[in-house]
């Protein structure tokens, strides 16, 4: 059965849920006229994963049932969108249902394709390879940090659009601090690899970060 909503939001992440909540708070007449389309069972507060990877918080604390975060007055459609039809103001769902809209908000987040980097899919989550960008592997980050004894600790900034550009640097500083507190810093070569030509895009902050990495004896490989 085809459906129509005044506002359709694709994505039940922080962005999609926040937009729906603010619209409903601003205009109560939008109740039952907003749909959030997302196939996921769980909603994750992903900014917390930096602290999960550093052993400061738990993955469980970042996760809630999707149903519990859908704002009152919005309708959750537990489906994936298979195609857009902007000429008809509609989207087609995985079961071929057509959902029509007056306004569309597109906030599906990013899909991580581990297989795009040779060897990464086979090694992610083991063999010293971890990532804070996925609930499947973020706990392995803490496992690697807490069991580190000596060698190279390499933190990489991807050369593609990512969920949080500062995340690789944040976990690097937290790991480096952990190494210092546990008196193994002298055994660690902390390396930050970035495809960019600066640590941060804003000059005054970049200058301060350059001072910090030098002070902490962190090697930065640019470009």
Where are these regions (language model features)?
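FAD-binding core/adjacent interface of flavoenzyme oxidoreductases
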Residues: 1-5, 75-170, 177-183
């Amino acid at each position: 059965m085809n459906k129509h909503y005044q506002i359709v939001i694709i994505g039940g992440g922080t962005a999609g849920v926040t937009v729906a909540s603010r619209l409903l708070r601003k205009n109560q007449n939008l109740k039952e006229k907003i749909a959030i389309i997302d196939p996921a069972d769980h909603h994750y507060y992903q900014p917390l994963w930096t602290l999960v990877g550093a052993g400061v918080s738990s993955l469980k604390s970042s996760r809630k049932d999707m149903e519990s975060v859908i704002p009152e007055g919005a309708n959750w459609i537990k489906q994936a969108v298979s195609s857009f039809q902007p000429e008809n103001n509609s989207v087609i769902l995985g079961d071929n249902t057509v959902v029509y809209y007056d306004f569309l908000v597109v906030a599906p987040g990013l899909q991580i394709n581990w297989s795009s980097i040779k060897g990464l899919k086979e090694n992610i989550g083991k063999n010293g390879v971890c990532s804070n960008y996925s609930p499947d592997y973020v706990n392995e980050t803490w496992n690697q940090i807490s069991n580190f004894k000596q060698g190279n600790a390499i933190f990489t900034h991807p050369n593609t659009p990512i969920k949080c550009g500062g995340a690789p640097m944040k976990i690097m500083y937290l790991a480096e601090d952990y190494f210092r507190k546990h008196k193994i810093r002298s055994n660690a070569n902390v390396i930050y690899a970035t495809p960019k030509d600066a640590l941060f895009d804003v000059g005054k902050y970049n200058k301060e970060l350059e001072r910090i990495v030098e002070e902490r004896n962190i090697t930065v490989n640019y470009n």
